[in-house]
Design a protein with these regions (language model features):
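Alpha/beta-hydrolase-fold serine-hydrolase catalytic core, especially in secreted/extracellular enzymes
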Residues: 34-71, 427-431, 436-524
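Short beta-to-alpha linker loops that shape the active-site pocket of alpha/beta-hydrolase fold enzymes
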Residues: 129, 183-187, 333, 429
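Short substrate-entry loop that stabilizes the transition state in hydrolases
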Residues: 144-148, 153-192, 336, 394-396
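Alpha/beta-hydrolase active-site loop
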Residues: 200-299
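Conserved alpha/beta-hydrolase "nucleophile elbow" surrounding the catalytic nucleophile
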Residues: 306-308
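The feature captures the conserved acid-bearing segment of alpha/beta-hydrolase catalytic domains
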Residues: 325-431
Length: 524
């Protein structure tokens, strides 16, 4: 089998080289129709998109950026230690940010830099329903309308931390929003454990296998007294409650004010109310009694957003909570349903069925929400944007073309329910495209730009009711984007996946319907 004219740059990462070898050995060229062999040369170029941010970081080694990156990361750890010394009641350790290298801080999005440019950034601490202290930041601009829509953003799991999403929070603030970012329990600067008797209710923040001692497992049911049915989830995945319940706690805090100070809800496990801790800490100045930027928030125009496990939470909470008007789920939008274990959900997801073999967590997320509360699933009523990429967490090439609709099933379900939705699949993108990993974890260069653009446009339509939002969504720039072409291995200016269909189904402001099932090709 001959593949002529195929070359990788000398700086290509080892993963891309191994992927290319796999393709040359096992794939044969052909038309990329579902079930047929993909073009190995095209797939090799697509895989190179995966490593663009890492290549960009390597290109910055001769500049001052690495030193500023190191300084920002060290400063984060310094502030972390100072905060813990000043407030011994807090207990974030151990989590991923206990280790310096797993929480790199982008110097371009620091609070001091934001404030110097005219931005407002208010660090906040508040008590969750499990009694843990959660850490976050409220963002806005000094100039702008007196009342603005609000967005609450939830991190992803495992190595998620608030600073990885500050780029998006600042972009939304510049666009006219008030934004709350925060670390879910067990991540970043938030406590790992709750207050007795709910120490384990929201612990471990989605970390695989540690879910065995969380409330979704049989062990957790015994420890925490949860009422989940025996056998309902084996506890293989992490604990989803820090994301589902934590985002609602964060929303409650975001909508608090001096005349309605924040108080946590009763814990899910034991029904214990930890309001006394919140009131005590607020009185002592070690927690905020209410949102410090409350005057700016228009509580009738609220959106939820999140990445990874945070996107799962936003998908559920945005339907379950009547205060929410729009949802953005960055890898990945899910459909509410009966609770299911995280690891089992990935292992059985249709998108991960390759050549008739079920391979867990290879290419995408399951369609149904995992790790969700044991409650009746809410109906689909709130408009939702779904964004994902061609790949998930590893640059595994496609030997055969996948089902092109397999990453838009959730969006299609919204359409069947008569609710606006979109599914945007980034060409060559992966799970890290929606977080700021500063290139230490590879991702595409344009992924964050595309996520920022679509997130802003989606909220502009449903929260700000911008007169230009319909035109932005129905005539997007991403089919012919010069910046995408400039960094793309093949010079392709079209940022939409050719493996999977991207779609948009919305009602325009004038009441007419716009539906396009292939945004890469475009629709009239």
């Amino acid at each position: 089998m001959r593949h002529s004219g195929l070359r990788l740059p000398a700086t290509a990462p080892a993963g891309a080289v191994l992927a290319l070898v796999w393709l040359l050995l096992f794939a044969s060229p052909g038309v990329a129709a579902p079930g047929q062999w993909v073009d190995p040369a095209a797939e090799a170029r697509n895989l190179l998109i995966w490593s663009e941010t890492t290549k960009d970081l390597v290109g910055k080694l001769g500049t001052g950026y690495p030193a500023r990156l190191a300084a920002a990361t060290v400063d984060y750890q310094r502030r972390r230690l100072e905060a813990l010394r000043a407030d011994p009641e807090r207990q974030p350790n151990p989590n991923s940010c206990t280790l310096v290298l797993t929480c790199p801080i982008d110097p371009e999005v620091g609070i001091d830099r934001w404030r110097a440019s005219g931005g407002l950034a208010e660090p906040v601490l508040f008590t969750s329903r499990s009694g843990a202290t959660l850490s976050g930041t409220v963002w806005a601009t000094a100039d702008g309308p007196a009342r603005r829509p609000g967005v609450v953003f939830a991190n992803g799991s495992i190595v998620g931390f608030e600073q990885a999403y500050w780029f998006l929070a600042q972009a939304l603030a510049r666009a006219g929003y008030v934004v709350l970012t925060y670390d879910p329990q067990g991540e970043g600067m938030s406590d790992q454990f709750g207050e007795a008797p709910d120490q384990l209710e929201d612990a471990f923040a989605g970390t695989p296998l540690l879910g065995f001692v969380g409330p979704q497992s049989l062990t957790g049911a015994l420890l925490n007294g949860t009422n989940r049915p025996v056998g309902d989830g084996l506890g293989l995945g992490g604990n989803g409650l820090p994301f589902y319940d934590g985002q609602i706690d964060a929303l409650d805090f975001f909508l608090s004010a001096p005349d309605r100070p924040y108080l946590p809800r009763p814990s899910r496990s034991t029904g214990t109310n930890h309001s006394a801790k919140q009131q005590r800490r607020a009185a002592a100045g070690t927690a905020r009694g209410y949102n410090p930027l409350w005057k700016l928030v228009d509580d009738s125009e609220i959106g939820l957003a999140g990445h990874s496990y945070g996107a799962q939470a936003a998908s559920w909470n945005g339907q379950a909570d009547h205060r929410v008007r729009a949802i953005v789920a960055l890898d990945s939008l899910c459909l509410p349903g009966p609770p299911q274990d995280e690891m089992l959900a990935f292992a059985t997801a249709p998108v991960n069925n390759i050549l008739g073999v079920q391979l867990p967590a290879l290419y995408g997320f399951p369609d149904r929400c995992f790790g969700s509360p044991n409650e009746p699933p809410p109906a689909l009523t709130t408009p939702a944007l779904h964004m994902t990429g061609d790949y998930l967490l590893a640059p595994v090439p496609y030997a055969q073309a996948p089902d092109p609709e397999s990453k838009s099933h959730a969006s299609q379900a919204y359409s069947k329910a008569g609710v606006d939705s979109a599914a945007i699949v980034l060409r060559g993108g992966n799970h890290i495209d929606f977080a700021d990993s500063v290139g230490l974890i590879p991702s595409s260069l344009r992924g964050r730009d595309m996520a920022t653009w679509y997130t802003t446009a989606w909220f502009d339509k449903y929260l700000r009711h911008s007169p230009t939002a319909d035109a932005e969504l129905t005539d997007p720039p991403w089919r012919n984007d010069s910046a995408t072409a400039a960094v793309d291995p093949s010079g392709d200016a079209n940022a939409y996946s050719y493996h999977y269909l991207s779609r948009l189904d919305i009602t325009r402001a004038d009441g007419t319907r716009y539906r396009c099932e292939d945004l890469r090709a475009g629709c009239a």
